[in-house]
């Protein structure tokens, strides 16, 4: 009996210990399938940061921190993180308000109220939960009472229609925010004086505009759904059940979507008058499942494979799991399934928080439908076929995405109007000062006065993602990538009518003109016409108020179409020699493919590129950009002066070949037939530098199971990997003996589904068996997508949790952009499907 009692006590003690949180070597708390992170991330405006809870492979809540509004948006003040210390079983983070580096200045300026405070957030285990304690060095001023408090945001996408409890109250998370409303005084009547004089100052009144403003959105909010001391989210589901108990002031459950359409559900408690020590104390108790293990995720291309291309599957598993045995490759036919191959996966090792297995089935070449099975997990069904890339893979970029993004046009698709003719009232000269989204107008950089109409700029261009602005690097960059795609692969496609004179686009109505070249033309038009109007490059064109910037809906609704009034967009200029030269290179590339298609525009592109190059200095800081321009100008004109400059840069090229190699490779190949000593020395040195670069690439690619250089950060890495694959193609095309083509396939497969995380969707919307069909584009308010748009992709919840949510308002995961976001992907597909090397550009005849 005594032995039984002792055994029971020991088992109880072991169970209790197993169910308490432990601080692990990665700097966060873990118990079973639940992780609690504290300030490993700091991106609060993107709903990443503060105290974060991950339960059984899903991020449930985040951004646990002091905020100055009940339901802040991305333009409300965020603290500055000063220090983080994870030791002795607890995590203590020191933060402060204000962050003067962001007050009325910076990429997206914020307005901080008059409260200077340093505070600590201490997170530590208590019982089966986590205790969060906030200590302030300065009490909350009267005007912030009822405003300043500790917020915890709950991801809404998992919660619609699901239950919650608050003390004796209960409710269901609604699909849309519901009244009643609360009206209160705004913090904006107490703006601080924190501008430190670095950079230019923003004008909050201008950004506010009239009526509702995202910059001033704390005066009308949703009334809380409930008030109490103990809150439980998802009491019906042990895998997501989370209880929060406040040991200080009341908890209130708010709906952040009432004053910001992209808001989350917010649980908060306000800081009491005079409180400093223990100003906030919360006990957070997630339901812990000790037995939960991450189920295997099979990662393959959601589109499929050419018969002859490499085929490799990556299987993501719980790091505590042992391999489950063989992987089965199943072929699906009219009479059912047949196992065509049993493969024992190779243990690749650990990356992020998972153990990875890999298997190769490149020798399977018979066309058909296939699926991979491993344990209880199954991949999507995919094809092996010689025509796997020939329809609905790269084509939606040209067929849908780029036409839909076109500015100054009415875009129709049969019954559907994607958007009406927009921004025909472009544009007024921007006011001097710091604006939004990185726009910053400096004095003395325009021959137009502030607010003066700049004529002739209401043509061409694409809206950049959901922001509706035209950035020079996006416009020229997109045209350039498309130009190189056409130059390399000479692809013929005509499924769209484009009429700039009538401002009309008709999707699925051919007009007898190549659609890729029409899109090159569209990008060149906005850059060239703006240059001609301003006498210099524009920085871009963007709306004048924050409400316009955050607009959800038809692009034509942003302005009234009548020129010379306050709703017109602004055009910006800048003094940026590197960007000017990059644009020159891009225009020179576009000029080549526009010859014979639009000769006048081709010559205008070339003239501007030559002018920008000739105006540039010999400053070493712009040397790489100038080299790129010289390469494109030589390929376009054949003029020896450009080649002479390139050859003189041999040292720069070889020492920074990771940057210069891809665009210089075309020149080096042309020089291989030259017999002069200078050319031969250049070719030899360049080849040696490339061989050394390949060694570096191999080391970087070996760091992950995906076969490409990939070091994840807050933003999804899809665009970076696409760009890498795009640049790598020029190396494998010119030097296949050094750079095997397999890396091009690896980069493409990453985009098409072979990437980390439980969501193995294709980043290319509408492409493949499973793809990102909820995205941050112009129709994000409808939880929809644009075919051919490519999202940013799987992000990292630091330090080690890959995440791709089905949610339209996380730009770091699901945004579309111009300047490569989709065109790099399109180029990769064309490169993958091209069996022969491309033809080098032909130099113009003398």
Pin down the residues of each PLM region.
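Acidic, glycine-anchored loop motifs typical of Ca2+
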Residues: 502-519
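Aromatic (Trp/Tyr) and acidic
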Residues: 202-235, 303, 311-375, 388, ...
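Extended, loop-rich substrate-binding clefts of extracytoplasmic carbohydrate-active enzymes
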Residues: 68-140
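Low-complexity, Pro/Ser/Thr- and charge-rich linker/hinge segments at domain boundaries
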Residues: 159-165, 291-310, 379-417
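Beta-strand-rich recognition/accessory modules
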Residues: 207-291, 832
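Beta-strand-rich N-terminal accessory domains
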Residues: 19-88, 184-221
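Acidic (Asp/Glu-rich), glycine- and aromatic
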Residues: 131-181, 376-388
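Sec-dependent N-terminal signal peptides
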Residues: 4-14
């Amino acid at each position: 009996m005594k032995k039984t009692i002792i055994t029971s006590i020991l088992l109880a003690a072991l169970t209790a210990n197993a169910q308490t949180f432990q601080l692990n070597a990665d700097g966060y708390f873990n118990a079973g399938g639940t992780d609690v992170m504290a300030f490993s991330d700091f991106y609060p405006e993107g709903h990443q940061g503060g105290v974060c809870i991950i339960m059984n492979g899903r991020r449930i809540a985040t951004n646990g921190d002091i905020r100055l509004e009940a339901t802040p948006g991305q333009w409300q003040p965020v603290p500055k993180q000063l220090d983080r210390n994870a030791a002795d079983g607890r995590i203590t983070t020191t933060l402060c308000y204000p962050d003067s580096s962001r007050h009325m200045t910076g990429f997206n300026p914020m307005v901080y109220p008059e409260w200077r405070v340093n505070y600590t957030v201490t997170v530590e285990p208590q019982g089966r939960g986590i205790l969060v304690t906030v200590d302030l060095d300065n009490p909350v001023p009267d005007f912030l009472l009822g405003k300043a408090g500790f917020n915890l945001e709950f991801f809404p996408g998992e919660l619609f229609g699901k239950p919650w409890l608050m003390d004796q109250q209960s409710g269901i998370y609604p699909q849309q925010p519901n009244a009643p409303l609360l009206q209160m005084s705004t913090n904006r009547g107490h703006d601080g004086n924190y501008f430190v004089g670095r950079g230019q100052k923003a004008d909050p009144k201008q950004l506010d505009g009239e009526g509702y403003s995202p910059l001033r959105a704390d005066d009308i909010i949703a009334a809380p759904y409930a008030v109490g001391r103990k809150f439980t989210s998802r009491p019906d589901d042990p895998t997501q059940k989370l209880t929060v108990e406040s040991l200080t002031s009341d908890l209130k459950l708010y709906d952040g979507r009432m004053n910001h359409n992209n808001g989350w559900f917010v649980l908060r408690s306000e800081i009491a008058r005079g409180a400093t020590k223990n100003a906030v104390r919360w006990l957070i108790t997630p339901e812990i499942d000790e037995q939960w293990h991450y189920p295997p995720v099979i990662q393959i291309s959601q589109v499929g494979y050419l018969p002859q291309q490499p085929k490799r599957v990556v299987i993501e598993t719980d790091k505590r799991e042992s391999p489950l045995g063989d992987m089965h490759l199943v072929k699906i036919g009219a009479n059912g399934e047949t196992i065509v191959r049993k493969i024992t996966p190779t243990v690749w090792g650990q990356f992020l928080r998972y153990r990875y297995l890999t298997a190769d089935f490149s020798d399977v070449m018979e066309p058909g439908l296939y699926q991979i099975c491993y344990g209880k997990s199954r991949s999507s069904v995919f094809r092996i076929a010689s025509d796997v890339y020939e329809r609905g893979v790269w084509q939606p970029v040209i067929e849908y995405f780029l036409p839909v993004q076109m500015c100054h046009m009415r875009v129709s698709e049969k019954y559907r109007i994607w958007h009406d003719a927009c921004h025909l009232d472009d544009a007024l000269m921007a006011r001097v000062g710091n604006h939004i989204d990185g726009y910053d107008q400096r004095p003395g950089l325009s021959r137009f006065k502030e607010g003066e109409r700049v004529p002739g700029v209401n043509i061409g261009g694409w809206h950049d993602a959901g922001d509706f602005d035209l950035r020079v690097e996006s416009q020229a960059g997109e045209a350039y990538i498309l130009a190189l795609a056409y130059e390399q692969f000479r692809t013929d496609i005509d499924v769209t009518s484009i009429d700039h004179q009538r401002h009309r686009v008709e999707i699925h109505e051919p007009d007898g003109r190549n659609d890729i070249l029409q899109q090159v033309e569209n990008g060149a038009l906005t850059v060239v016409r703006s240059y001609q109007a301003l006498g210099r490059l524009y920085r871009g064109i963007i709306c004048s108020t924050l409400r316009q910037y955050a607009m959800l809906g038809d692009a034509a609704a942003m302005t009234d179409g009548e020129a010379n009034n306050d709703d017109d967009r602004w055009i910006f200029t800048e003094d940026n020699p590197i960007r000017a030269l990059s644009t020159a290179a891009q225009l020179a590339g576009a000029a080549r493919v526009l010859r014979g298609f639009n000769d006048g525009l081709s010559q205008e592109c070339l003239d501007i590129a030559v002018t920008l190059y000739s105006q540039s200095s010999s400053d070493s800081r712009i040397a790489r950009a100038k080299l790129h321009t010289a390469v494109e100008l030589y390929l376009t004109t054949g003029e020896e002066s450009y080649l002479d400059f390139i050859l003189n840069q041999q040292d720069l090229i070889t020492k920074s070949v990771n940057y210069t190699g891809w665009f210089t490779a075309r020149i080096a190949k042309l020089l291989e037939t030259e017999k002069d000593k200078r050319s031969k020395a250049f070719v030899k040195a360049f080849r040696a530098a490339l061989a050394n670069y390949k060694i570096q690439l191999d080391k970087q690619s070996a760091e992950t199971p995906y076969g490409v250089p990939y070091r994840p950060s807050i933003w999804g890495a899809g665009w970076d990997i696409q760009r890498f694959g795009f640049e790598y193609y020029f190396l494998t095309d010119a030097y296949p003996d050094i750079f095997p083509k397999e890396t091009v396939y690896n980069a493409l497969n990453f985009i098409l589904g072979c990437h980390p995380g439980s969501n193995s969707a294709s980043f290319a919307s509408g492409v493949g068996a499973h793809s990102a069909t909820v995205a941050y584009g112009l129709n994000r308010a409808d939880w929809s997508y644009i075919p051919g748009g490519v999202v940013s992709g799987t992000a990292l919840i630091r330090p080690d949790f890959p995440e791709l949510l089905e949610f339209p308002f996380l730009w770091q995961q699901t945004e579309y952009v111009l300047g490569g976001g989709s065109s790099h992907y399109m180029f990769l597909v064309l490169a993958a499907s091209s069996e022969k090397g491309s033809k080098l550009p032909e130099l113009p005849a003398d």
